[in-house]
């Protein structure tokens, strides 16, 4: 039998190497994602099935093991001492166990530390409405939302309810009262928790992910009733985010949803993590603010015009992804080559580079 490395040693390696993720899979050594690239843990052996099982079972309790074996996959999170938390997706592949572990640092960074535009701080001051933070997996959505919630928590006397699967960043009540509910442990589903949320006297509700019609409908209702709602979507732009929310509804409901969204939507931050010169990654974001022009576009179903409105909306704090990338190149933070890799429109990027 192969001697498995201790899971604690691998978790310490994640933190030491400033990795974002650890991957465990039969037939490979433990793999780290460092600055966006996968690299093997130095001097680690290739893992066999027993080694992977030992590593994964070391971070599961008995109930969690049974869920994983029954359902074939399982999401959970756990604290690793004072060093951070890990969000885990354990699953089966080709008949063997495997897992992806993402590091969630204990320290919650500020909007400034994340490199996000100044206007993003104002999202925490909205009295009501819907704010979306969007992007692909691993784009820093949870980190940005944690920064906004932390700002509210330490500056305002609000009742904040988060509904997450699983809980990532943990918030200790400060000026605000923070309630964090984890799907499968504290509630059966996002939709069930959202139905209860309105009876819990919230000021702010965070929805970890809007995955289906019922969750999106609940988010709209909560925002319409005078609360501030933060939520995430796996979309790459403001226009795509709006279309995604509307398209989950049957055609006969879509005009009504457009009207509701046009009234409650406050802002969308669509972000990616871009490798910096040297090491590390920085958030690059498209920012949409719901001006009267934006609300009309949503109401009339003309989201194809959204990019143009964002490009000309700098006075309101809006900026396109390409403009953000150019600013980062000019600041010496990222290379022009990386900017091209993440550009929405390379011709537009080059035009902006020329000034």
Sequence positions of predicted segments:
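Short, flexible helix-loop junctions that flank or precede catalytic/ligand sites
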Residues: 1-355
């Amino acid at each position: 039998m192969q001697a498995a490395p201790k899971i604690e040693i691998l978790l310490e390696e994640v933190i030491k190497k400033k990795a974002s993720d650890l991957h465990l899979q039969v037939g490979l050594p433990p793999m780290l994602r460092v600055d966006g690239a996968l690299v093997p843990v130095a001097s680690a052996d290739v893992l066999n099935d027993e080694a992977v099982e030992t590593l994964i079972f070391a971070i599961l309790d008995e109930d969690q093991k049974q869920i994983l074996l029954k359902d074939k996959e399982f999401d959970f999170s756990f604290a690793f001492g004072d060093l951070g938390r890990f969000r885990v997706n354990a699953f089966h592949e080709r008949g063997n166990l495997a897992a992806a572990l993402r590091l969630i640092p204990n320290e919650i960074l500020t909007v400034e530390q994340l490199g996000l535009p100044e206007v993003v701080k104002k999202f925490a001051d909205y009295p009501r409405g819907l704010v979306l933070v969007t992007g692909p997996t691993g784009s820093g959505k949870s980190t940005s939302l944690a920064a906004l919630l932390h700002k509210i928590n330490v500056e305002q006397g609000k009742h904040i309810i988060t509904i997450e699967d699983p809980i990532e960043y943990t918030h200790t009540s400060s000026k605000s009262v923070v309630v964090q509910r984890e799907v499968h442990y504290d509630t059966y589903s996002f939709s069930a928790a959202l139905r209860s949320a309105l009876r819990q006297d919230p000021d702010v509700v965070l929805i970890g992910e809007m995955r289906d019609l019922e969750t999106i409908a609940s988010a709209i209702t909560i925002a319409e009733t005078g609360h501030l709602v933060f939520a995430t979507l796996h979309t790459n732009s403001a226009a795509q985010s709006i279309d995604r929310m509307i398209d989950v509804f049957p055609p006969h409901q879509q005009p009504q949803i457009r009207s509701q969204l046009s009234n409650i939507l406050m802002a969308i931050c669509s972000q990616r993590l871009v490798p910096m010169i040297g090491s590390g990654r920085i958030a690059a974001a498209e920012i949409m603010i719901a001006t009267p022009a934006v609300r009309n576009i949503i109401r009339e179903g003309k989201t194809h015009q959204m990019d143009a409105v964002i490009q000309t909306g700098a006075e309101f704090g809006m900026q396109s992804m390409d403009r953000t990338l150019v600013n980062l190149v000019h600041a010496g933070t990222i290379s022009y080559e990386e900017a091209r890799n993440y550009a929405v429109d390379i011709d537009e990027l080059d035009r902006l580079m020329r000034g």
